[in-house]
Amino acid sequence: MTVTAFAAAMHRPFFNGYSTMQDMNSGQGRVNQLGGVFINGRPLPNNIRLKIVEMAADGIRPCVISRQLRVSHGCVSKILNRYQETGSIRPGVIGGSKPRIATPEIENRIEEYKRSSPGMFSWEIREKLIREGVCDRSTAPSVSAISRLVRGRDAPLDNDMSSASGSPAGDGTKASSSCGSDVSGGHHNNGKPSDEDISDCESEPGIALKRKQRRCRTTFSASQLDELERAFERTQYPDIYTREELAQRTNLTEARIQVWFSNRRARLRKQHTSVSGGAPGGAAASVSHVAASSSLPSVVSSVPSMAPLAMMPGSLDPATVYQQQYDFYGSHANISVSAAAPMASSNLSPGITTTPPHHHQFYNPSANTASYIMPGENGNTTPTGNIIVSSYETQLGSVYGTETETHQTMPRNESPNESVSSAFGQLPPTPNSLSAVVSGAGVTSSSGANSGADPSQSLANASAGSEELSAALKVESVDLIAASQSQLYGGWSSMQALRPNAPLSPEDSLNSTSSTSQALDVTAHQMFHPYQHTPQYASYPAPGHAHSHHGHPHAPHPHAHPHPQYAGAHPHYPPPSSSAHFMPQNFNAAAFPSPSKVNYTTMPPQPFYPSWY
């Protein structure tokens, strides 16, 4: 027989002894996974039940019985367990049948007692069974059960005598409890035995099964385990040839090898489940903010090429990033980098590499100054550059630190759990965020312009210029906010401490007037580009020091400009037009310039979402 024919024969319906096909023709028959036919709700025929018990008595394993008879393994186990308990193969009622106390051994002993002394009463038989140790009082059959058994044993003798004398057979009800009665008195008028007689005759075959069919556990040696593990590494489901080869090498049977592979696969699945379930995704979100804030004044990595990585978290998962996006570091607003303190370099760590400032709803440069320290050529920062940047960012922090202002364009959300509506659509880390990351040559050229001046004089000039700029920015930002707040927020003036559940849609923002759009353009540019001198600031006096970004023309730049898209129009690029272009999420009603202003030839393509989103 070919393999195809064997497979077809395996899937051919196998009729498990049902006498008629009327139930099958009525559509009640089903085919199980083994190809055997069963009728749902109908017990398995007695001949199949008897065959299961006989095969089990011959020492055949239940799994082999299941495959040969095409009966499910659960059905085989249930029939065998019930036969062990009751001594009967008859199907019980739903919920299981009552265990029969009178086992075949007890029945044989009762028959001996009755044959030796026919006048013995049932209660005397019970007491004798207990006295001789055949059973104890908890397992001894009841008096009524012994009486029924004695009457059933006496019935064949009466039927034999009545049939021998020519008298008609009995009613057949009493004689149905023994196999011998079926031959003499179980026939009806048509000469065909009834189904009840056959079922009752075969329900108690009297086959002695071993009470404990469990074998001793197999103990594997080290060499056997080594062979099995090597084979398991090659394949988890060995074929017949692999099992035969392993059986020769390990001196084990194929059945033992098959069981070992099954147990090994189960153990592997359990290990995978424990590993995947033991590390929940939210466990990394419980990073302490105290540890992150304690290392805040330290400097970013000493490698200049690693400086852009300070803008994005290196080893944080999205849950931690979302947690930090809602932590605005309000308790660390007073922490600033001291100009006289030596700047100690440290490794890039999650405590320092926080999310970019334009990913925070409230950007306070004075609270996160460490991410903007300008490294020198040897990794250390020059004191002059630190003084200027620290002073300049401290002044800008007073302008852009909206937690201390009375007019808040974006109210703070106190809940760190609403990470979907706010974290979705945050700006990716673009070259705009690398506003102060420059090489050592830029700092050298900046400090070279002030080589003849004293550092204290430079600090005074920087402070004076920054104060003038901050005063002008405060006045202008207050006017812009007052002009746009009524259009954008309307009735939300009384709810400034709360944040709306969803960001404003682009349609709501597009309904504003052209002047409001102009104001939104300016406000957005102030939020996301705090270090650029925009044209509206041209009327104010410039600071008294040479800034490293704007103190020299663009052509002889010794370092890569942090804003390549503005390189063609530096330092005065055209102001944003009144028709603002909005993205699908307008990022808390912040307008962006039209993409036609962007020089795509010099700006590398940036993904909309960062890699760690």
From Swiss-Prot:
Stretches with biased composition (Polar residues): 403-424
Main subcellular location: nucleus
Signal peptide: none
Keywords: Developmental protein, DNA-binding, Homeobox, Nucleus, Pair-rule protein, Paired box, Repeat, Transcription, Transcription regulation
Region (PAI subdomain): 30-86
GO cellular component, one term: nucleus
GO molecular function: DNA binding; DNA-binding transcription factor activity, RNA polymerase II-specific; RNA polymerase II cis-regulatory region sequence-specific DNA binding; RNA polymerase II transcription regulatory region sequence-specific DNA binding
DNA-binding is among the record's keywords: yes
Database matches in PROSITE patterns: HOMEOBOX_1 (PS00027), HOMEOBOX_2 (PS50071), PAIRED_1 (PS00034), PAIRED_2 (PS51057)
Biological process terms in GO annotation: nervous system development; periodic partitioning by pair rule gene; positive regulation of transcription by RNA polymerase II; regulation of DNA-templated transcription; regulation of transcription by RNA polymerase II
Localization annotation: Nucleus
Protein name: Segmentation protein paired
